[in-house]
Regions:
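Asp-box/BNR beta-propeller blade signature and adjacent active/binding-site loops
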Residues: 1-195
Length: 195
């Protein structure tokens, strides 16, 4: 009914949170629906050693049940997820080491992760949340699959909010495919989406 009525909320904490973790959060940002209908949200949690970790949680039954496997990279938070090929998820993470984004991919919903070639190299950041979305060829004028990314394009301070496009699956983010929206201070979190 287009959001006029809603079911009662379902508490999924016991399904996904290890009791030894200090907390578990989604995002911030948005989740995705994969081509096969799987719902996926980026997550962050602080483990029993008080170290933050980013990963994903997913549901194959329209949100009735949820699962988490392994984190993608330790000392990371505030991630965004995109399906870059059918069944392949890319997790783009705030890295508390600073300077640049950490990026990993998984083909098995986070049971195993592979560091992406662009990780800690291609996207600078000031230790801040960022946004990542996949835009299919049918939905853009270039007629090719692209990734869009937004963040404060600096290594210190939250300014120069920029949107970047990658035409090669996130390997490169060339200057000619970037638009700076505002160079002023005060820009931090952003969330890209398709409507």
């Amino acid at each position: 009914d287009d959001g006029k009525t809603w079911s009662k909320p379902i508490n999924i904490t016991e399904q996904v949170k290890d009791p030894s973790w200090y907390f578990l959060l989604q995002g911030p940002g948005r989740g995705i629906t994969m081509q096969d209908g799987t719902l996926v949200f980026p997550i962050q949690f602080i483990d029993s050693t008080r170290v933050p970790n980013a990963g994903i949680m997913y549901s194959k039954d329209r949100g009735e049940t949820w699962k988490i496997h392994n984190y993608a990279r330790t000392n990371t938070t505030e991630a965004q997820v995109a399906e870059v090929e059918p069944g392949v998820l890319m997790l783009n993470m705030r890295d508390n080491r600073g300077g640049s984004r950490a990026v990993s991919t998984t083909k098995d919903f986070g049971k195993t992760w592979t560091e992406h070639p662009s990780s800690r190299k291609a996207l600078q950041e000031p230790v801040c949340m960022a946004s990542l979305i996949s835009v299919k060829a049918k939905d853009n004028a270039l007629n090719k699959d692209i990734l869009l990314f937004s963040n404060p394009n600096t290594v210190k301070g939250r300014h120069h909010i920029t949107i970047k496009a990658s035409l090669d699956g996130g390997i490169t983010w060339l200057p000619e495919h970037q638009v700076m929206l505002d160079e002023g201070e005060g820009w931090g979190y952003s969330c890209l989406t398709m409507i």
